[in-house]
Amino acid sequence: AIGERYEGILKAACDVIARRGFHQASIREIARAAGLSLAGLYHYVGGKDELLFLVLDRSLDRLIDELDLALAEARTPELRLLALIRTHLGFGFRHAAALKIINRDWELVSGPRRDEISAKRQSYLTRGLAVLREIDPHGRSGDELLSATNLLLGMLNGIATRPFLRSPEDARTLAAEVGALFLYGFLEATPRSTDLQAADIRRP
């Protein structure tokens, strides 16, 4: 029961902070969304700063774990790129509020805890960088690959929210389209995105 209550508090905090913004979200509003009195909320957490950290910490752990699992199952560099894209878009579909907070509010975490969140964000970025390095046929520099990784993740952040994603199938279709665009370029003749989807389905 305590664990369920705690999860409910974090979900309420995530929803309120994503909708209102960290500075505009009040601890009283979060308590109300969690079905608690203000005193009841403080029984579980120390305040809004702690809630922001906990939401970010858990959300990033979930995102990284999902990516690691997807990458482990992908058998080729191309499928690992598709796994990265699909994981990010799928996370955005299932946890849109969390992804918004990860991208918008993480720098508002105070003190040493911000370093913890920054390290987890960097860990995720490093995984994306490794995917692009593996697939790069031109021996690009580290700076070029980092720019490409940031470009890819920025594009995914831009579309990983409704109304672009209305279903898991939307996430799968968009992932194939983004993968084709990123792999083959806009001006090149490209395999159809449906071919990438089929390749993903056929993977051993």
Where in this protein do the model-derived segments appear?
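Secondary-structure edge/capping motif, primarily at the C-terminal ends of alpha-helices
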Residues: 67-70, 74, 102-106, 159, ...
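Helix-turn-helix
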Residues: 8, 12, 16-50, 54
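Amphipathic alpha-helical segments used for helix-helix packing
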Residues: 93-112, 161
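Alpha-helical bundle regulatory/interaction domains
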Residues: 55, 59, 190-191
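C-terminal peripheral helix-coil segments that are non-catalytic and often amphipathic
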Residues: 90, 126-134, 155, 161-204
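Hydrophobic alpha-helical connector segments
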Residues: 54, 68-97, 148-152, 175
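Short hydrophobic clusters on alpha-helical segments that form packing/core surfaces
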Residues: 5, 9-17, 88, 156, ...
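Amphipathic alpha-helical packing segments from all-alpha helical-bundle domains
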Residues: 58-68, 91, 111-137, 146-150, ...
